């Protein structure tokens, strides 16, 4: 579980205090598989316990992992259920986890945002386990293998259409308060990402780096406008790499500029740069990182993502003038 905390020195009028509930590998939830009515009750009780703890800690927003890597945690007509729910790929858990999470969040006065991993599709073993239900089988043209993993290809025009189809399912059918994109970037250390054909076909004279950045921007723009056309009140956020001094490994690097441009172009509601750190020593350097990560754009706050296990289990580690729980 990761948490989101405001970094302003003075508390804003409307403060977001959010936590990521991670389903991949069962890191946060679920720990129980639903193979019986009792399993359903236990799995739901585990989530309720997490939500109760977050409510008691004064959180007001939950980012519930809804899509992992080519599989999902809601009843979808496009991608299969994640095996973490039942122990079987595509296994119906007997209830709709996303609908349940939304209802329980709203009971506690908390917002629920659907957290969707976008570009990565998992390693070869994972993709093979999904079989014919994998997007790599259904939509081969938009998928590429790279370094023993599979990815959606941001440079293919149909990629944004595919991602939008997933988002549309969620926004139209569920009372979500927001859509949150994770891993909306090219893979790390990927100068040879296999998109040369698409680059030649679609670049229109742009450099490779600029073309790749534009591909990601176009995905965000397309989905943001689609969401707002369906439900204008639903927030759209994304999680760029938070290591602002160490982004050379990413072909789409330059997230601070991307965020500022995205906000000014009105294609993103909230930027959530990720730290992904949980060492005690990181607590000392966190205020420095926070103060230099980016300057908030006009009309928006500045937020960052922390590791919730560290924060909730040892809150004194992250106590300081920049963070409050």
For each feature predicted by the language model, list its residue ranges:
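Aromatic- and acidic-residue-enriched segments that line the glycan-binding/catalytic groove
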Residues: 72-87, 120-146, 184-204
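Aromatic- and acid-rich polysaccharide-binding/catalytic face
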Residues: 177, 182, 197-205, 248-267
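Catalytic domains of carbohydrate-active enzymes, especially glycoside hydrolases
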Residues: 42-71, 173-178, 251-258, 315-321
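Active-site-adjacent "subsite" loops/lids of carbohydrate-active enzymes
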Residues: 14-16, 22-45, 103, 114, ...
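Aromatic-lined carbohydrate-binding/catalytic grooves of carbohydrate-active enzymes
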Residues: 57-93
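Aromatic-lined carbohydrate-recognition surfaces of secreted/lumenal glycan-active proteins
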Residues: 102, 106, 111-123, 180-187, ...
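Aromatic- and glycine-enriched glycan-recognition loops and surfaces
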Residues: 36-57, 84-108, 214-222
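Substrate-binding cleft of secreted/luminal carbohydrate-active enzymes
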Residues: 54, 61, 254-271, 281-325
